[in-house]
UniProtKB/Swiss-Prot annotation:
Acidic residues composition-biased segments: 61-77
Region of interest: Disordered: 24-79
Classification via SUPFAM superfamilies: Immunoglobulin
Annotated protein name in UniProt: IgNAR transmembrane form NE
This protein's record includes keyword Protein biosynthesis: no
Residue ranges of every copy of the Ig-like domain listed in the record: 1-36
Keywords annotated in UniProt: Adaptive immunity, Glycoprotein, Immunity, Immunoglobulin, Immunoglobulin domain
Stored InterPro entries: Ig-like_dom_sf, Ig-like_fold, Ig/MHC_CS
Biased composition (Polar residues): 24-35
Native organism taxonomy: Eukaryota, Metazoa, Chordata, Craniata, Vertebrata
UniProt organism field: Ginglymostoma cirratum (Nurse shark)
Tissue: Expressed mainly in lymphoid tissues including spleen, epigonal organ and circulating lymphocytes. Also expressed at low levels in the pancreas.
Basic and acidic residues bias spans: 41-56
S-S pairs: none
Gene Ontology CC terms, in alphabetical order: immunoglobulin complex
């Protein structure tokens, strides 16, 4: 399993050219870890350009942060078993 997030940050060219650093921090509630990336201008903008640059930041998280595939399937099976038990109880109660 692979998870990804894409974020789009619009910056004025003046700020981008200055070499300012921007930090993006992301976390997922079941995960104990936090992903943190620092981005900056990899190369200078065209001279005289006042356009806003768009810089996509892609964060790839490790599937280990969310447990193994077997752990995830086990959680799904537990949820399915609970739903089945509840439905069985309701049907028997109505009869």
């Amino acid at each position: 399993l692979t998870f990804s997030t894409r974020s789009l940050l619009n910056l004025p060219a003046v700020e981008w050219k200055s070499g300012a650093k921007y930090t993006c921090t992301a976390s997922h509630s079941p995960s104990q870890s936090t992903v943190k990336r620092v981005i900056r201008n990899p190369k200078e903008s065209p001279k005289g350009s006042s356009e806003t640059r768009k810089s996509p930041l892609e964060i790839m998280e490790s599937p280990e942060d969310y447990g193994t595939e077997e752990d995830q399937l086990e959680n799904v099976n537990e949820d399915s078993n609970s739903s089945l038990s509840i439905m069985t109880f309701v049907i028997l109660f109505i009869l």
